[in-house]
Swiss-Prot record:
Keywords: Cytoplasm, Ribosome biogenesis
Lineage, opening ranks: Bacteria, Pseudomonadati, Pseudomonadota, Gammaproteobacteria, Pseudomonadales
GO biological process terms, semicolon-separated: ribosomal small subunit assembly; translation
Localization: Cytoplasm
Cited function: Required for maturation of 30S ribosomal subunits.
Protein name per UniProt: Ribosome maturation factor RimP
Gene3D superfamilies cross-referenced by the UniProt entry: Ribosome maturation factor RimP, C-terminal domain, RimP-like superfamily, N-terminal
Family membership: Belongs to the RimP family.
Pfam families named in the record: DUF150_C (PF17384), RimP_N (PF02576)
CDD domains, alphabetized: YlxS_C (cd01734)
GO cellular component: a single term: cytosol
Membrane-traversing stretches: none
Amino acid sequence: MHEGVQVSSKLEELQALLAPVVVALGYECWGIEFSAQGRHSMLRVYIDKEGGVLVDDCAIVSRQISGVLDVEDPISVEYTLEVSSPGMERPLFTLEQFAKYVGEQVKIKLRSPFEGRRNFQGLLRGVEEQDVVVQVENHEFLLPIDMIDKANIIPSFD
């Protein structure tokens, strides 16, 4: 099986397991990242709530998630669990999240090249069906959501 497919299905499994726990605690599960890199694997869970997330919020969610992970044991390698807010360089995971930030500057990295490139930085113009529309200089790109490896808002300090 292709490694990207394994990571993708692992993310789906973790999302299904952990999102209900986060929601039950009164937070939004903004997204989950899992990078399997041998002994330095990382499970990062982003939480959000109206008014912002405090360190205490992260600690509460981390304790609950740790308990679930200990019982369910979905990850076979050693890993570090990190619970955090999305922050200023907010990662984007879903089409709904992209739609919410239309008009913002974004940085997107694809899993594989699209039109000869993997990295795009520009204006988020919209969402069309399963594509994210990004304007880079004078060219619009329709990037399929399933090709996006990582996407972040670029904060503006105007």
